[in-house]
A protein has these predicted regions:
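Conserved small/polar residues in nucleotide/adenosyl-binding loops
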Residues: 114-123
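Short, acidic/polar
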Residues: 31-42, 91-105
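Active-site beta-loop-alpha junctions enriched in small/polar residues
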Residues: 21, 54-56, 83-87, 116
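A structural motif corresponding to the C-terminal end of an alpha-helix
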Residues: 46, 106-109
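Residues at the N-termini of beta-strands
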Residues: 50, 110-113
Length: 125
């Protein structure tokens, strides 16, 4: 897998990332965990080291699933990104609470990157 080096940050990420918004699903809409785990494992085996998920993906099930699967890997072997749901935040305390929840769901501290998601107006920021 080709990597991109970010000298100032001292990191090297794969040119391809693995997005966790659309995992295979069961007929009832839940994540098909065996199939999804195989996909994530295969991406990591191929050298992908940037994993991207978000608070609302798969009705909130993506972060906990990704956190569970990634437990078997050395935390220093991948970069994990998630997104803070700005539509659910009205105060600094809300942001802190939701971010703490995300760390719990992902079973990690820290995440590598946090993006602000779905900010449609300046008021969301």
């Amino acid at each position: 897998m080709e990597k991109r080096k970010f000298e100032k940050l001292g990191i090297e990420t794969s040119l391809l990332g693995f997005g966790c918004m659309r995992f295979p699903a069961t007929p009832d809409g839940k994540i098909d965990e065996p199939r999804a785990e195989k996909l994530l494992d295969r991406a990591i085996a191929a050298g992908v080291n940037y994993i991207d998920t978000a608070y609302p993906y798969h009705n909130g099930d993506s972060e906990p699933f990704v956190g569970k699967v990634l437990q078997k890997y050395d935390r220093n072997s991948f970069y994990l990104a998630t997104k803070l749901p700005v539509w659910a935040i009205e105060s600094v305390d809300d942001a802190k609470r939701i971010f703490a929840e995300q760390l719990e769901r992902l079973r990690t501290d820290p995440v590598s990157y946090t993006h602000l998601r779905a900010h449609e107006t300046p008021e969301h920021l």
